[in-house]
Swiss-Prot record:
UniProt-recorded name of the protein: Zinc finger protein 384
Organism whose genome encodes this protein: Rattus norvegicus
Keyword Zinc in annotation: yes
Xref: SMART domains: ZnF_C2H2
Residue spans of biased composition, Low complexity class: 500-513
Encoding gene per record: Znf384
Amino acid sequence: MEESHFNSNPYFWPSIPTVSGQIENTMFINKMKDQLLPEKGCGLAPPHYPTLLTVPASVSLSSGISMDTESKSEQLTPHSQASVTQNITVVPVPSTGLMTAGVSCSQRWRREGSQSRGPGLVITSPSGSLVTTASSAQTFPISTPMIVSALPPGSQALQVVPDLSKKVASTLTEEGGGGGGGGGTVAPPKPPRGRKKKRMLESGLPEMNDPYVLAPGDDDDHQKDGKTYRCRMCSLTFYSKSEMQIHSKSHTETKPHKCPHCSKTFANSSYLAQHIRIHSGAKPYSCNFCEKSFRQLSHLQQHTRIHSKMHTETIKPHKCPHCSKTFANTSYLAQHLRIHSGAKPYNCSYCQKAFRQLSHLQQHTRIHTGDRPYKCAHPGCEKAFTQLSNLQSHRRQHNKDKPFKCHNCHRAYTDAASLEAHLSTHTVKHAKVYTCTICSRAYTSETYLMKHMRKHNPPDLQQQVQAAAAAAAVAQAQAQAQAQAQAQAQAQAQAQAQAQAQASQASQQQQQQQPPPPQPPHFQSPGAAPQGGGGGDSNQNPPPQCSFDLTPYKPAEHHKDICLTVTTSTIQVEHLASS
């Protein structure tokens, strides 16, 4: 006897169910296939359900396996019931073929000897033609087609046409009703011509082998961008399948690549290398036009647009509606619009401060966390910084590069902040009025004083700072009081000077108001009336004239006094001479 294509090893065969159970399973499978796979063609292979085999004796060994149903039923059907049997004719077929058999439930009582005959096994060849056997040893009172796989275990799954069982059942019914027996060849329906289209399930998801390819509707949305691969977890789209697979590892796989400088981990070594450039400050991508360098190639490509010969509107097509600035992409425009609107969507979780840019929030968060990702790579230097600009300024100290020079004294500094602090010493406006209470050092601003106080590291810095502020306030109040006292003293001195001036003026006025002294008899001032007698004689004596002409040297009043003195002396001399 030839070996059957079915595996005869009972180890690979599960327990054989009853005929009623097989019929229920078959009806359930056909129902589920009608619901889930409404279209022709399916990418899912049906499961193989072992059946109860009853091989008739009329089939020869060359075309199949012959066995009497009544005599061999006990050998092949140890689990079957005594009153119900299932009859399937098995014919050897190539391993790529498909067998469709009519499964019948024959209510056969042993006391009845008559059986109705029907068509036997139906086989589909690899070319697609249906072959029915003309065996008369089968019993098909009720024709319920069932799919039986003829492949050995481990073979490739077969493509099953869902409606094939119904068509075979109708064919068997017509042939059985027409005369009961003859076999024939039934041609399957021709497949539709043209390119195969993606089959859609009722749930709306496309049925395809590659889970990363976009659906037809999504292809239309991303046709302009050229992104045909989408992540199933976060719906991001990518240009190539490799990029999407690398991205998908962030959702499903672990991140074995850890940064040696911080606690971040990455799923790909390329992402880790790109992240390490942040700590090292390396910028391997340089611009050929302006010699600027960038950490990522995409940043260099975006920067190269500035040097392009295209028009400015083409390079920066996105224009701000509030001002005349233009931008190369929408993200830069959205970031710029926050300046006009005042929106600050990024909030600090520690102090509730808000920022317009995410990078500003990240820099601010490092103040609370103490993270210093920018470390100096100079041998023997272990300094780290929160910002890249601070690291670049620190590197100039190792290189002895001091590009910031003072135009007054020609001193040079490594950064602009140091130069600005130095320039304040050349101006009177920025005087060093903030003095340290511990070492008496003075600074131009309170911020510098606070930084200096941290170096002393006192046990209670805040109290000392408050005491210093109170002492400064007291000193300022005392200075104001002294200034007020000086102002009052000056006012008093001015008042005294004014009083003295007024007194001198009053004394001068009193001296001017006193009457002149009496004159001698023989001296008459010019214009005086003659002495003596009668009223109105025409002979008037001329006034005596002074023999001393002192007019060029003295004014009239002093001249009068001198004349009186000289006259008195003359009278005395004459009196002495006469005596």
